[in-house]
Amino acid sequence: MSRTIFCTFLQRDAEGQDFQLYPGDTGKRIFNEISKEAWSKWMAKQTMLINEKKLSMMNPDDRKLLEQEMIKFLFEGHEVHIEGYTPPEE
């Protein structure tokens, strides 16, 4: 059975995560406040960041950068800036 939460990112009720996807207090906050739809949007941005900045998840500094960008994107309303990327026109 799906959970409905108020998604901080979307600013509306939406389907919540089935389980905690990220460790620690940040993971608990994501589980309680971020919907599946918002998480999917973050995953696309995360993939772009990893590829364009050539981040390695084995490098603690790269993981820290990714976590900071995730928090800014999901909770603070900041767009992820990727040099040279122009979003497609709608």
Curated annotation (Swiss-Prot):
It comes from Erwinia tasmaniensis (strain DSM 17950 / CFBP 7177 / CIP 109463 / NCPPB 4357 / Et1/99). It holds the Pfam family Iron_traffic. Belongs to the Fe(2+)-trafficking protein family. The keyword Hydrolase does not apply. It comes from the Bacteria. GO terms for molecular function: iron ion binding. Keywords: Iron. Monomer. InterPro entries: Fe_traffick_prot_YggX, Fe_traffick_prot_YggX_sf. One of its GO terms (cellular component) is cytosol. GO terms for biological process: cellular response to oxidative stress. Could be a mediator in iron transactions between iron acquisition and iron-requiring processes, such as synthesis and/or repair of Fe-S clusters in biosynthetic enzymes. Gene3D superfamilies: Fe(II) trafficking protein YggX. HAMAP family: Fe_traffic_YggX. This is Probable Fe(2+)-trafficking protein.
